[in-house]
């Protein structure tokens, strides 16, 4: 069994923002795996299905970014799932736009959604797929993460979202080491 959580902020006003690339990846996975993400449970929009005989839960926490851990904590405790089968997908300002980085575990890197998850799960030992959104040119991080991609960036991000969805599938199918060697550039 796997829980895949894509981080973002709920609401139409946040759709397409840099901070919501995690939601975009869940939408891509929803299509690829045929799992509808529409039920409200665990403070999230969720969908449940199967991939290669394994149960898969897709989550889009509706708590707002800084409280993402509340949603994931509820789901992990309900299903009693080992943390190595929890995959978190989120934006990373320290990676250039469209770059993907997969890690087996690690710190939050200053990402508040990840801070919340690590704090409430009391562990850094779960896989994550990070998608680069680049650094703000003017230094205003809040405006940057809540801002939209330029037309040029959008093309790169659309491809990155598809690659990130493929990376998650690769983790489930072939393990994290395989996915890291295939997708970390």
Curated annotation (Swiss-Prot):
The active site is at residue 19. It is found in: Cytoplasm. It comes from the Bacteria. It is an enzyme of class 3 (hydrolase). The record marks 9 as: Discriminates between blocked and unblocked aminoacyl-tRNA. InterPro entries: Pept_tRNA_hydro, Pept_tRNA_hydro_CS, Pept_tRNA_hydro_sf. One of its GO terms (molecular function) is tRNA binding. It catalyses: an N-acyl-L-alpha-aminoacyl-tRNA + H2O = an N-acyl-L-amino acid + a tRNA + H(+). SUPFAM superfamilies: Peptidyl-tRNA hydrolase-like. Hydrolyzes ribosome-free peptidyl-tRNAs (with 1 or more amino acids incorporated), which drop off the ribosome during protein synthesis, or as a result of ribosome stalling. Catalyzes the release of premature peptidyl moieties from peptidyl-tRNA molecules trapped in stalled 50S ribosomal subunits, and thus maintains levels of free tRNAs and 50S ribosomes. This is Peptidyl-tRNA hydrolase. It comes from Caldanaerobacter subterraneus subsp. tengcongensis (strain DSM 15242 / JCM 11007 / NBRC 100824 / MB4) (Thermoanaerobacter tengcongensis). The gene is pth.
């Amino acid at each position: 069994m796997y829980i895949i959580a894509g981080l973002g902020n709920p609401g139409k006003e946040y759709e397409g923002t840099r901070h919501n690339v995690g939601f975009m990846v869940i939408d891509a996975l929803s299509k690829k795996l045929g799992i509808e993400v529409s039920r409200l449970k665990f403070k999230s929009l969720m969908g449940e299905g199967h991939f290669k005989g394994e149960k898969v839960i897709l989550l889009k926490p509706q708590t707002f970014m800084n409280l993402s851990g509340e949603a994931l904590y509820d789901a992990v405790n309900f299903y009693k799932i080992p943390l190595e089968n929890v995959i978190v997908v989120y934006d990373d300002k320290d990676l250039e736009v469209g770059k993907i980085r997969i890690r087996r575990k690690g710190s939050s890197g200053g990402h508040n959604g990840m801070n919340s998850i690590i704090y409430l799960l009391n562990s850094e030992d779960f896989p994550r797929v990070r998608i680069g959104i680049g650094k703000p040119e003017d230094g205003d991080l809040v405006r940057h993460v809540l801002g939209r991609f330029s037309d040029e960036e959008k093309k790169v991000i659309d491809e990155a979202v598809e690659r990130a969805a493929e990376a998650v599938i690769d983790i489930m199918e072939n393990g994290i080491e395989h996915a890291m060697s295939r997708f970390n550039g």
